[in-house]
């Protein structure tokens, strides 16, 4: 379900707020949606601090301009009561989880968590990432695929330091001792993990 897809990524990233109750919050969403819908009379002001990372249950909803990532994952419009949600599987959903500002930030934070909690060696960090996200013993084939992905991305960002700066370091702080290139590569790894069928469909 829409809220659970976001909440799971939020939880795995380590950013999720455990705060309960209180008013609705305004997590990141694509810019200018409200300005276009309301002729510039209203705007979506992204919440700051802990409220930015509260569960989807607390997200402000407006029927005329629903929160886009939830709408993409079949959240009901609230115009009528919904007994059962109809689930779909569309390419647009993958665009959200790969490119939406919030999901990219979740991937960045998950990368930081992998780096700081996973050990000192790359192989240990990748094993930690698999155990954390899939919640089962690490399979050799998955580890090999993830290692190949990491090495390829690391080589890419070593040749393109400006691209590494674009991907990591603006929202989530750089861990002590880490390089931007390494964290950018880990962010791609984290993004891929958050988009696995085992995470989105079976998690």
Q: Each predicted region: which residue ranges?
A:
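An acidic, gly/pro-interrupted, aromatic-rich
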Residues: 1-125, 162, 172-203
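Amphipathic alpha-helical core segments of compact helical bundles
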Residues: 103, 131, 151-155, 194
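Short linear loop/turn motifs
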Residues: 24-27, 144-148
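Amphipathic alpha-helical substructures
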Residues: 112-145
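Hydrophobic residues in alpha-helical segments
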Residues: 98, 114-115, 133, 150, ...
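Charged, solvent-exposed helices and adjacent loops that form client-binding or oligomerization surfaces
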Residues: 149-173
């Amino acid at each position: 379900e829409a809220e659970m897809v976001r909440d799971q990524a939020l939880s795995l990233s380590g950013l999720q707020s455990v705060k309960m109750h209180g008013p609705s919050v305004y997590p990141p969403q694509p810019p200018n949606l409200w300005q276009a819908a309301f002729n510039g009379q209203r705007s979506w002001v992204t919440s700051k601090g802990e409220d930015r990372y509260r569960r989807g249950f607390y997200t402000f909803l407006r029927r005329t301009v629903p929160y886009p990532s939830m709408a993409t994952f079949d959240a009901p419009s609230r115009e009528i009561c919904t007994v059962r949600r109809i689930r779909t599987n569309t390419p647009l959903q993958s665009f959200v989880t790969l490119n939406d500002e919030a999901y990219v930030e979740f991937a960045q934070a998950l990368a930081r968590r992998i780096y700081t909690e996973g050990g000192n060696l790359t192989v240990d960090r990748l094993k930690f990432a698999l155990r954390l996200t899939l919640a089962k013993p690490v399979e050799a084939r998955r580890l090999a695929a993830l290692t190949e992905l990491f090495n390829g991305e690391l080589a890419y960002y070593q040749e393109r330091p400006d691209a590494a700066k674009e991907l990591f370091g603006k929202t989530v702080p750089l861990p002590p001792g880490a390089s931007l290139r390494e964290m950018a590569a880990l962010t791609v790894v984290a993004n891929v993990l958050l988009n696995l069928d085992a995470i989105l469909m079976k998690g």
